[in-house]
């Protein structure tokens, strides 16, 4: 590709004459010169502002360190300015070489004229009368070949030599220390990762759980106190002969409220525990990247939530004990009411002798124990029923058996 000696003079002349010429080379050289000037101005401005003014105004270790680090940046700007100027000089040299190669090239029309003239003479050289002229034209063509090939070869050598002088641009020096870079990367990764969102969400859930536990504990305490008050009032105001439905309803109400209270406590404790576990796991995984203020807030939140849960458990335990005591008293009253109310007999049973007669025949002999058991504490209460049963047995056939008659 770069061996221009193998190309004929017309080919080299054609390749050199086509294209935009050296105009792009001159334009690129001017651009690099402008860049070199801007870099030199920037380096001078930074040097005058920081390297010289800061140590003079603020003497100390910090200002000296700043001036030292900025000095490396100023040196980098100066080096790039020199490199840009070198590239501009190289482009100038290449443009000059191109102009010289074009100027030393045999024009394309001259080469084509020689070729056409030689071919025409050869066409009429029947007897060799123009052989000398043809040989001279061919010798001129050979000189054209050498001249054009030499011009292209010289241009090639100049371009390779000048471009070899250029140097690569160095990256900018690091003005910030490695420690500050690591801290910045840690903060950026913490703010951009999902773990920070999960941590903030867990903290919010923990605050919500504590608030719900306090609110639910207050409501449960109020409901338990109201239930205990209603049970105590029912125990004091009800008569000994009341029906067992009232005490049973109070007992069911207190048991239901206690169950709901304990169920709410379980759900609150579960949610608070989940929030605590999530917060602990996230805190341990991001302990190396979060700020100390976040860790202190998490520790304070955990302590507050633990104290709130302990207070709520103590209040629920005291409420459960109060409800159990009241329920035991109501159950005792219900037992007495059942033993009394179950033996009340309506007055119209005195006329219903035949159905009682049939029932008495079917009662087994062991019913004497039941009659004896209930007749003791109910003196003066079961007398009408006893008289009815005695009259009914006396009017019948008396096949109830000796045990039944003795019981009656």
Curated annotation (Swiss-Prot):
Keyword Repeat: yes
Keywords recorded for this protein, A-Z: Repeat
Residue ranges of the region described as 2 X 6 AA repeats of S-V-A-Q-S-E: 209-235
InterPro entries tied to this protein: PPE_C, PPE_dom, PPE_sf
The organism's place on the tree of life at top rank: Bacteria
Sequence repeats: 209-214, 230-235
Protein name per its UniProtKB record: Serine-rich antigen
The keyword Nuclease belongs to this UniProt entry's keyword annotation: no
GO BP annotations, alphabetical order: response to host immune response
Family to which the UniProt record says this protein belongs: Belongs to the mycobacterial PPE family.
């Amino acid at each position: 590709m770069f061996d221009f000696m193998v190309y004929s003079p017309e080919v080299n002349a054609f390749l050199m004459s086509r294209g935009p010429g050296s105009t792009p080379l001159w334009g690129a050289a001017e651009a690099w010169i402008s860049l070199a000037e801007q870099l030199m101005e920037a380096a001078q401005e930074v040097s005058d502002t920081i390297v010289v003014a800061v140590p003079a105004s603020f003497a100390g270790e910090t200002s000296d360190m700043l001036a030292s680090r900025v000095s490396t940046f100023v040196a980098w700007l100066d080096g790039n300015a020199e490199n840009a100027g070198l590239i501009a000089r190289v482009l100038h040299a290449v443009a000059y070489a191109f102009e010289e190669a074009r100027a030393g090239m045999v024009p394309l029309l001259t080469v084509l004229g020689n070729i056409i003239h030689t071919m025409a003479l050869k066409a009429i050289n029947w007897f060799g009368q123009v052989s000398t002229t043809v040989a001279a034209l061919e010798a001129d063509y050979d000189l054209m070949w050498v001249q054009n090939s030499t011009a292209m070869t010289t241009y090639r050598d100049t371009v390779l030599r000048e471009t070899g002088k250029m140097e690569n641009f160095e990256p900018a020096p690091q003005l910030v220390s490695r420690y500050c870079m690591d801290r910045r990367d840690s903060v950026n990764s913490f703010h951009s990762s999902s773990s920070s969102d999960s941590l903030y969400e867990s903290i919010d859930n923990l605050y919500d759980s504590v608030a719900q536990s306090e609110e639910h504990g207050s409501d449960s305490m109020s409901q338990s106190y109201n239930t205990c008050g209603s049970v105590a009032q029912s125990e004091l105001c009800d008569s000994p002969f009341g029906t067992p439905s009232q005490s049973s309803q109070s007992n069911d109400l207190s048991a239901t409220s206690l169950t709901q209270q304990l169920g709410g406590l379980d759900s609150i404790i579960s949610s608070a525990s989940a929030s605590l576990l999530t917060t602990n796991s996230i805190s341990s995984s991001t302990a190396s990247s979060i700020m100390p203020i976040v860790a202190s807030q998490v520790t304070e939140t955990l302590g507050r939530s633990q104290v709130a849960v302990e207070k709520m458990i103590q209040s629920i335990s005291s409420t459960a004990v109060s409800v159990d005591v009241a329920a035991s008293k109501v159950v005792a009253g219900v037992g007495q009411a059942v033993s009394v109310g179950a033996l009340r007999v309506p007055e119209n049973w005195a006329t219903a002798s035949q159905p009682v007669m049939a029932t008495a025949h079917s009662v087994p002999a062991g019913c004497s124990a039941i009659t004896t058991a209930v007749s003791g504490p109910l003196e003066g209460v079961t007398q009408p029923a006893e008289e009815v049963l005695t009259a009914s047995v006396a009017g019948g056939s008396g096949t109830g058996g000796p045990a039944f008659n003795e019981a009656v």
